[in-house]
Amino acid sequence: MAKEGLGLEITELRLGLPDAEHQVSVVNKKNEKKRAFSEIDDGVGDENSSSGGGDRKMETNKSQVVGWPPVCSYRKKNSMNEGASKMYVKVSMDGAPFLRKIDLGLHKGYSDLALALDKLFGCYGMVEALKNADNSEHVPIYEDKDGDWMLVGDVPWEMFMESCKRLRIMKKSDAKGFGLQPKGSLKGFIESAAK
């Protein structure tokens, strides 16, 4: 700054953005056109204002400021509003290398769920597994809120929807080692849903 006449201003190290002196004058010109908050009105018919009606632009009110609220809390808030309509649970099947999600709220009973699982994994036999567990090679089980694994169909549908955290379709031989014995108890649920 002592050597202003030598042309070394370009290579001089200083705090701030490069060419900040030039930008300060540009920023000041932009700020001259801005109005203070107290000068802003609600846009209610002020035709005799000093700036004139034609120069003023109507500002659109945004419902949210960009970047606020944080994305996580925004998604959480929106998911709470839609919580009753969407009840996704993860579904895994023994032998399948992937997991799927299914919306329990779309299904009216165990028979609809069994048909959806048949379509989802491309294996046919879930309806038979729910009707007569002795003749099928797969057994559908679910994990409830307490972390206990139970057979699908042991409880009424509404209670199942409230307590189900995830579904698993096991091979019947593994289910016996797991401590679950298929009882064929869904026969009444399937027959009542079919009527």
Swiss-Prot record:
GO terms for cellular component: nucleus. Transmembrane segments: none annotated. A motif (EAR-like (transcriptional repression)) lies at residues 13-17. It is found in: Nucleus. Residues 37-60 are annotated as: Disordered. Its main location: nucleus. It holds the Pfam family AUX_IAA. Induction: By auxin. Keywords: Auxin signaling pathway, Nucleus, Repressor, Transcription, Transcription regulation. PROSITE patterns: PB1 (PS51745). GO terms for biological process: auxin-activated signaling pathway; regulation of DNA-templated transcription. Signal peptide: none annotated. Belongs to the Aux/IAA family. PANTHER family: AUXIN-RESPONSIVE PROTEIN IAA17, AUXIN-RESPONSIVE PROTEIN IAA19. Homodimers and heterodimers. Aux/IAA proteins are short-lived transcriptional factors that function as repressors of early auxin response genes at low auxin concentrations. Repression is thought to result from the interaction with auxin response factors (ARFs), proteins that bind to the auxin-responsive promoter element (AuxRE). Formation of heterodimers with ARF proteins may alter their ability to modulate early auxin response genes expression. The N-terminal half of the protein contains two conserved domains I and II. Domain I includes a slightly degenerated ERF-associated amphiphilic repression (EAR) motif which seems to be involved in the activity of transcriptional repression. Domain II is required for the correct degradation of the protein through the SCF-mediated ubiquitin-proteasome pathway. Interactions between Aux/IAA proteins and auxin response factors (ARFs) occur through their C-terminal dimerization domains III and IV. This is Auxin-induced protein AUX22. It comes from Glycine max. The gene is AUX22.
